[in-house]
Amino acid sequence: MTPAQNELLKELESFARTAPTAEAVMERIAKLLHEKLTRYNWVGFYLMEGPAFDVLVLGPYVGSFSPTLRIPLDRGLCGAAATSGETVVVNNVGADPRYLGSDLVKSNIVVPIFVTKSEVTKSEAKKRVVAELCIESYFADTFDTAEQKFIESCAALVGRYME
C-alpha cells in the first residue's frame, strides 16, 4: 500500500471504531474512496439477501452512473466473487463476458466481505459472504496488487462490524 492509502485506511479504522452501524462504515468508505482516489468512478457495496442468501442487493454507494440494483449469484463479476469467496479483479472489462455494467468502465474489482467478529470462527467466516465492496474505474489497469491489498483491507474493516 502507498503512504496515502495507509493514511486513508487509518482514518477509516478510526471512524469505524465509533460508527453506529456497519452501514455507516460502508457509507464512509464509499464516500472517502470516491473522493480521494480519483480513478475510482463508482464505489459501492452489495449485501447478500434473499431467502437463501442468493441475491446481492445494492447498499451504500457513491458514483457517476446508475448501478445494478439486484444481482443473482450466478451473474456478473459480483456473483463470481460472492460464490467463490475470492477477490475478482478485471483490468479490461471489455474482454470479460461476465461484466454487466456501463460501457464507460474499463476496470473493476469486487472484494467479498466476511463476518469477522470475534465470536465467529475463521472457518465459519470464510463460508459466509455477507456483502461485497465493488469499485469501477473508467481507466484500464487501475487495480494492481498494492491497490487490491488496500481495497481488501477496506472490505475487511466492514466485516468486523457486520452481523
Each model region followed by its residue ranges:
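Short loop/turn motifs at secondary-structure junctions and domain boundaries
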Residues: 37, 99-105
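A short, aliphatic-rich beta-strand micro-motif
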Residues: 107-124
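Regulatory sensory and allosteric helical modules in signal-transduction proteins
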Residues: 47-51, 59-101
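Short hydrophobic beta-strand segments that form the core of ligand-binding sensory/regulatory domains
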Residues: 108-112, 129-136, 142
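Intrinsically disordered, low-complexity terminal regulatory regions
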Residues: 1-66
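Residues at secondary-structure transition points
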Residues: 3, 20, 68, 72, ...
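Juxtadomain coupling helices with adjacent low-complexity linkers
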Residues: 2, 13, 137-163
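Short coil/turn motifs at secondary-structure junctions
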Residues: 50, 116, 138-140
